[in-house]
């Protein structure tokens, strides 16, 4: 059984027991979170597709960790001008473990 849900402007395909990195959620480690915007639920041959969401379906998860991703470097280089600008960015994320899918 797996489901596709939406969080942080992105869609994630998950099954029970899977650990997923999402955009930062303001929750403490160990907290339980429910995602109601479930777009699709598949259980063997039974497929439920929402228009736009599946009514009554939700994905339940537990917050495992909060953290920051790998550094992305941004470089602006002006040739022949002896000018260069560098910047770095690390995006915050929340790691959750899927504990249940209800349809």
Curated annotation (Swiss-Prot):
One Gene Ontology term of the molecular function aspect: structural constituent of ribosome
Lineage: Bacteria, Pseudomonadati, Pseudomonadota, Gammaproteobacteria, Pasteurellales
Keywords: Ribonucleoprotein, Ribosomal protein, RNA-binding, rRNA-binding
Name of the protein this chain belongs to: Large ribosomal subunit protein bL21
Stated family: Belongs to the bacterial ribosomal protein bL21 family.
Domain of life: Bacteria
InterPro entries linked to this entry: bL21-like, bL21-like_sf, Ribosomal_bL21, Ribosomal_bL21_CS
UniProt source species: Haemophilus influenzae (strain PittEE)
Signal sequence interval, chain numbering: none
HAMAP family given in the database record: Ribosomal_bL21
Gene Ontology biological process terms, A to Z: translation
One of the record's GO cellular component terms: cytoplasm
Quaternary structure (record): Part of the 50S ribosomal subunit. Contacts protein L20.
Pfam families attached to this UniProt entry: Ribosomal_L21p
Role, per record: This protein binds to 23S rRNA in the presence of protein L20.
SUPFAM superfamilies: L21p-like (SSF141091)
């Amino acid at each position: 059984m797996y489901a596709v849900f939406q969080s942080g402007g992105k869609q994630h395909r998950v099954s029970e027991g899977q650990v997923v990195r999402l955009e930062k959620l303001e929750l403490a480690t160990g907290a339980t979170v429910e995602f109601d915007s479930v777009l699709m639920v598949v259980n063997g041959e039974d497929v439920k597709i929402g228009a736009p969401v599946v009514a009554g379906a939700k994905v339940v998860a537990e917050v495992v960790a909060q953290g920051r991703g790998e550094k992305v470097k941004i470089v602006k280089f002006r040739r022949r001008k002896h000018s260069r600008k560098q910047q770095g960015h690390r995006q915050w994320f929340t790691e959750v473990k899927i504990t249940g899918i209800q349809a």
